[in-house]
Design a protein with these regions (language model features):
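Conserved glycine-rich cofactor-binding loop
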Residues: 10-11
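Short, small/polar-rich loop/turn modules that mediate ligand/substrate recognition or access, typified
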Residues: 78, 175, 180, 238-240
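Catalytic loop of short-chain dehydrogenase/reductase
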Residues: 90, 132, 138-162, 167-176, ...
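Short C-terminal tail/terminal secondary-structure segment
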Residues: 93, 228, 239-252
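Substrate-binding pocket helix/loop in short-chain dehydrogenase/reductase
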Residues: 94-99, 103-108, 208
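A short, exposed helix-loop element centered on a Lys and neighboring polar residues
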Residues: 119-120, 168
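Alpha-helical segment proximal to the catalytic Tyr-Lys
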Residues: 124, 172-176, 236
Length: 252
């Protein structure tokens, strides 16, 4: 199938994308920054099922780290054919007056600049004009990009809105290079980030969950399955698309 790099692949949605990608035949680079133990467990699980995987520590906001990650993945697994920009952070909840600028800057760098740096490196290697064979990029956005999340995390929502615009623009820019770029916009997913949202803003979270038409929050596989479809040949005519995965809530 090829080689996929999954940023933030040590836990949650990222870890499940890694596992499902391996089952579909991909060789997987599990990126992490702090979750070394968890990343290694994902790799071990893949290898126990006769898959190919490595873990690579890299800060996606640092160009040199990203370049090194791509180099290591290429040397150990082969040419990169797919990238999933999953690494992200929810930040602290609260109205705009409560924001700490240093933390907000970190949020923007991780959620928006990080995917840009990783995508730039991927395009340099995938684009036909650079000797590549094309490839696929999927960005993990959020339903917050549509709602704005007023009073809770407008700064987080803004980073994801920016990621959506980046997705549609880059898709048009690199389509002739054989590269497809898409995104998914999950709503609430049963992950550590969801638990943190519930801890910080329990009433807001519960009210939003009550308005989900299908009557439940998502499991990680609900998201990873769509990501793998977007990476597959079945989605070969799909680019510049943003798929809502929110149980019918926050959709057009």
């Amino acid at each position: 199938m090829g080689v996929v790099i999954v940023t933030g692949g040590s836990r949650g949605i990222g870890a499940d994308i890694c596992r499902l990608a391996a089952r579909r035949g991909y060789s997987v680079c599990v990126n992490y920054l702090r979750g070394e133990k968890e990343a290694n467990e994902v790799v071990e699980g893949i290898m126990e099922s006769d898959g190919r995987a490595i873990s690579v520590k890299a800060d996606v906001t640092i160009e040199a780290d990203v370049s090194r990650m791509f180099d290591e993945a290429t040397s150990k697994l082969g040419p990169i054919t797919a990238l999933v920009n999953n690494a992200g952070w929810g930040g602290q909840h609260g109205p705009i007056e409560s924001w700490q600028i240093a933390a907000t800057r970190k949020l923007i760098e991780l959620n928006l600049l990080g995917p840009m740096i990783c995508s730039r490196e991927a395009v340099k290697r995938m684009a036909r004009k650079h000797g590549g064979q094309g490839g696929d990029i999927v960005n993990i956005s959020s339903a917050a990009a549509r709602t704005g999340a007023p009073g809770v995390f407008v700064h987080y929502a803004a980073t994801k809105g920016g990621l959506d615009v980046f997705t549609t623009g880059l898709a048009k820019e690199v389509a002739k290079e054989g590269i497809r770029v898409n995104a998914v916009r999950p709503g609430y997913v049963r992950t550590e980030m969801y638990e943190e949202d519930l801890r910080q803003s329990p009433d807001w979270v519960r009210a939003n969950i009550a308005s989900i038409p299908v009557g439940r929050i998502a499991e990680v596989r609900d998201v990873s399955a769509v990501v793998l479809w977007l990476l597959s040949a079945e989605a070969s005519y799909v680019t510049g698309s943003i798929v809502d995965i929110s149980g019918g809530r926050d959709t057009q």
